[in-house]
């Protein structure tokens, strides 16, 4: 933590413990240093939640300076490439002194937005854990029966995971037979039980030798398969929590009325933008999502545009995935996508076009608090 005066001289610099009482004491102490005090932070994650909450309780506005901007600005300060918390704090304080009017003011989110942000991040972690577990499961399955690993659609078909949680060795699968495996999988609720059982037995019949370490590998396969099943249950429960909270938001029906956006993408959207009332325009939303090209002019070279590098890594996938879904299920989006393809654009470029267009539509729906209708009047294209 660092405090500078209006000339840039350091008035106070110390390490701050992330506890409520020291934070309150520090706020009171700094308020005595000057009539007007400006606070700026470079963190908005849970690590700064206590500080931001304490400052909000004290009716103190807080500005935000991104960590990237701090890193870039620190190069011109004394110390060169050295990086310490004390130096970063001084850079933040001095940049706030000089450029405070250009820095955005943080607005505290309500509990619903905070809960959605936590739950969506938790679901992302669970999905990543599931992917890692399936990859490890495939690796172990090769040590038991490579033919079985080749035919097992572990990612797209849950029935294979159910099968491997009970049967892993080729001999056990052959001895059980198609009919028995079909009954076991059918009782477990697997829809295509017969096709999975037939493919598994066919693959098991191609291998009669026992591979080294098969017993341990089979045990690990069963353990990993059970782990995938447990993760699936946790993801389902998390989805229910996300949907329940998302439906409580007053704009839930408005957001999900746009084709291609369900409760999961809608929750991700709210988690990324916070309060939708802060969105100033469709252009701002597009720039926030990294869908608006930025100029790259220099001297006589004008009119050059390039892809932005600074944008919300949470918001862009929401708009892109919603456009990708709408292209498949909405005739208007499909026609617009196809027109861009006919112009010679590649698939990703053609998908970004409806994603950019959807920012205009979504902003207008949120602004007017109305749901999307197929026969709604067209919304004017934005300049960006």
Predicted regions and their residues:
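A detector of single, family-specific signature residues
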Residues: 1-384
């Amino acid at each position: 933590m660092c405090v500078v005066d209006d000339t840039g001289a350091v008035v106070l610099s110390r390490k701050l413990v992330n506890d409520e009482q020291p934070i309150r004491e520090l706020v009171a102490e700094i308020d005595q240093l000057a009539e007007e005090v400006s606070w700026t932070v470079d963190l908005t994650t849970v690590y700064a939640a206590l500080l931001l909450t304490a400052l909000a309780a004290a009716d103190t506005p807080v500005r935000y300076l991104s960590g990237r901007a701090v890193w870039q600005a620190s190069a011109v300060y004394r110390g060169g490439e050295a990086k310490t918390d004390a130096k970063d704090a001084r850079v933040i304080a001095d940049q706030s002194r000089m450029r405070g009017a250009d820095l955005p003011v943080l607005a505290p989110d309500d509990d619903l937005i905070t809960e959605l942000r936590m739950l969506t991040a938790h679901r992302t972690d669970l999905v990543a854990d599931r992917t890692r577990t399936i990859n490890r499961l495939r690796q172990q399955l090769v040590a038991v029966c490579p033919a079985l690993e080749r035919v097992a659609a572990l990612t797209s078909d849950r029935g294979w995971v159910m099968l491997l949680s009970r049967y892993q060795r080729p001999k056990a699968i052959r001895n059980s037979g198609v009919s028995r495996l079909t009954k076991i999988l059918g009782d477990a609720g697997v829809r295509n039980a017969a096709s999975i059982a037939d493919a598994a037995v066919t693959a098991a019949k191609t291998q009669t030798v026992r591979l080294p370490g098969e017993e341990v590998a089979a045990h690990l396969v069963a353990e990993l398969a059970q782990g995938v099943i447990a993760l699936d249950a946790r993801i389902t429960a998390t989805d229910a929590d996300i949907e329940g909270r998302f439906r409580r938001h007053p704009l839930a029906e408005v957001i999900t009325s746009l084709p291609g956006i369900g409760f999961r993408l809608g929750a991700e959207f709210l988690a990324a933008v916070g309060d939708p009332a802060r969105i100033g325009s469709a252009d701002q939303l597009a720039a926030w999502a990294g869908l608006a090209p930025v100029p790259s002019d220099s001297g006589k070279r004008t009119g050059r545009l390039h892809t932005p590098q600074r944008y919300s890594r949470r918001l862009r996938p929401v708009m892109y995935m919603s456009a990708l879904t709408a292209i498949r299920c909405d005739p208007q989006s499909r026609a617009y996508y196809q027109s861009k393809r006919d112009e010679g654009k590649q698939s990703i470029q053609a998908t970004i076009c409806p994603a950019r267009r959807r920012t205009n539509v979504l902003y207008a729906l949120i602004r007017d608090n109305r749901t999307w209708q197929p026969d709604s009047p067209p919304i004017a294209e934005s300049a960006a």
